[in-house]
Amino acid sequence: MERPLRVPEQENDGGACWACLKHKRACDRALPWCKVCREHGIKCTGYEVRLSWPDDIIAKKRQRPEPNHHRRQSSSKSTQSPSSTTSSTRSDKRAMPSVISALNLPAEQSFYMQHFLQNIARVALAIDHQGNGYRSLLPMAMAEPAVLNAALAVAASHHSRWQHTADDVSRKYLGLACKALRNRFIDPKLRNSPVTLASMLLLVSYEVFSGSSRWKGHYDAIRGWIRGRQGNKDLDSFLMNWVCLIDTQSALNLGTSTMPELDEWMSAAPNNQDYTVDSLFGCSSQLPKLMSAASRLYVASKQDLVDEDDIRYQADNLQKRIRSTQLPEDSQIKVGLACTDASQEFSTTVGMERDELRRRAMATAEIFRHASHIYVYRIAHGPMEPLSPEAQESLETALTLLTRVPDALGPGANLGWCLVVLGAELDLEEQREYINSRWAGMHLLGIYNTKNGQSILNEVWNRRDLVSSGFADPERWQDTMQRIGQSQILV
């Protein structure tokens, strides 16, 4: 997938909301809205990334001749009331950046595309950086109805949850996206295009962000699509990474096998001397392929495909490989993807100082590593067996590292799977309350697979308490998840 349109972001490294930045106030960075703005009686304009568009594109819009119907409307403008003029002025201040208008999107679509680029692109991955793959979808969306309508459906649905309003728009765009996607599958020339994959991935996100299990139907289609085409040279590394994230999460949580085709994709990650963090997952770029291996070991254990001694032997070897992905405290991390050998210097576009974001990114990557250690340990040991000293150390270290990622801003948005894995080991009430407080912060993002994660973990705790009292048999959290009818991507 080509990326002909670069999408740079306006600078805001101070961590303040845009209103505090404008008025030069000390922002408290509270989510979802800054309390300082409320104290000053103004509406907080949020922390979202704002796009700065190339002057040559803006100039094209200015040079475009004005359509005739604008002249017919000019007389009616003079009859508008002062209140309507004021309202119009306010609307203009909130308008989509000029490049979107230049691409002729209607007002409603412009609004939701802005929301997708500024907000969803920021919270739907671990590290929002200048190479954010969600924003690189813009040129494709402007040219392809399937991608455009799928992105608008995701944005409209998310916006309604974020603002706690009725969602009476997203289904319209969802229907249009599905219709356009169906037409692509009918046409052999379009069926195997990366555009088709991007559209299906956005439909997965629509369902996952809504907390629905319907994402599985879309992902089954993606699996068939990948197996039915030859090669992946024309696929963008971000799309490939996106597929790997869903595939790995599905396998880890549901006890299914990962796609063997994806192992080759994830083998492109640079060696760990570069200390590269995967911007989509939030972990070391070498860890996703090991998480995939862990899911296969879990399947082998669950289906009794190998004996217990062999399971423990393979688990020990996998633990060593996971340990090798450790990021030293003083490492200068880079940002990359598991499906490419390219990486870039650490950069930040989120409202946070660069060093602070780097510390959070490193802590998040290490939390993923420790959670993976515990996950693999539980493959070879029963759900209520005491943790080994090494696994207990991983649990305690991960809980300490969570305090370095104090909220859902930036890398903290991607910790749902880790919270479930770590939380499933906790019995102390104060520790459980802390984990629930982390869920509450993540719910503010409006991505409701976090609510699935919390309900799964609460049921796991109920089961642990019953087991401790002698009223139930031990159960893995994955089995609890399926017993209560949950099947979700937790990252």
Where are the regions a protein language model picked out?
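Intrinsically disordered, low-complexity activation-like regions
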Residues: 1-191, 210-418, 422-491
